[in-house]
Amino acid sequence: MAAEFKHISVLKEELVAGLGVKPEGHYLDVTLGGGGHTELILQQYPDVRVTGVDRDSQAIAAASERLKSFGDRFRAVRSNFGEYQPQGEKFDGIIADLGVSSVQFDQGDRGFSFRFDAPLDMRMDQQQTLTAADIVNTYEEKALANLFYEYGDERLSRQIAKKIVMKRPIQTTKELEEIVFYTYHPKARKVKIHPATRVFQALRIAVNGELDALQYLLVNAPQWLKPQGRLGIISFHSLEDRLVKNAFRQRDIWRILTKKPMVASETEINQNPRARSAKLRFAELKETTE
């Protein structure tokens, strides 16, 4: 399985540079994935250590294999970062690359993408019980509509929810994709972004508790960081970016290092289209709270 997990990290150079890595520092990567960001830190700074956290067992296996040459400078922890608790240690910096990995999108049987006909799953942690099919088939119509609107900014949320309830049970990605697609007017179907994208995003966020995990990180990161430690977060949609921006602004313990988010270059976007929506924000923990 490890060989199959080849995630392409976005804004890799910018994220590592923005950390301001300190000699003999200890860093926390709460979204380890395939290990791309962690690998760059370990390569560029030979006296630092990184602890990597991921809820996906395939990611942990792949990253551990990829980074084994770094020995005890790297440690992997299988955990949802929304539940992670450091064992009394403090870090010089924390990084998070939010959302689903390119590998998870490309593994058709995991149900993250409507490009493949697969069970409606969408679990990052395959040991959890809640799936996208559970939500689609058990939520009341109003709850589904609210979910699609709030987590996906879906303007046809009510119409889509009504059709879903009429056609239940729905078990596969293609079934759901077709319902959403044909809810749209024929002219609105011929757009760059597929009509089902927002509904699939909303379901993925709900299944994996992504916003709750981010809130947990934003609340707890100050306790995990040493003074002048930095927190760098890459987000992929407006809900995430808004949470990060507001958390940095509303708590006086942070010194904001990016007044506007950093974005990918055209070169990177051409090489990795996923980078187009990525936004990177940094803040530094003040030495003392005022």
Swiss-Prot record:
It is an enzyme of class 2 (transferase). The gene is rsmH. It holds the Pfam family Methyltransf_5. Belongs to the methyltransferase superfamily. RsmH family. This is Ribosomal RNA small subunit methyltransferase H. The keyword Ribonucleoprotein does not apply. GO terms for molecular function: rRNA (cytosine-N4-)-methyltransferase activity. Keywords: Cytoplasm, Methyltransferase, rRNA processing, S-adenosyl-L-methionine, Transferase. One of its GO terms (biological process) is rRNA base methylation. GO terms for cellular component: cytoplasm. Its EC number is 2.1.1.199. PANTHER family: 12S RRNA N4-METHYLCYTIDINE METHYLTRANSFERASE, S-ADENOSYL-METHYLTRANSFERASE MRAW. It is found in: Cytoplasm. S-adenosyl-L-methionine binds at G35, G36, H37, D54, F81, D97, Q104. It catalyses: cytidine(1402) in 16S rRNA + S-adenosyl-L-methionine = N(4)-methylcytidine(1402) in 16S rRNA + S-adenosyl-L-homocysteine + H(+). The keyword Heme does not apply.
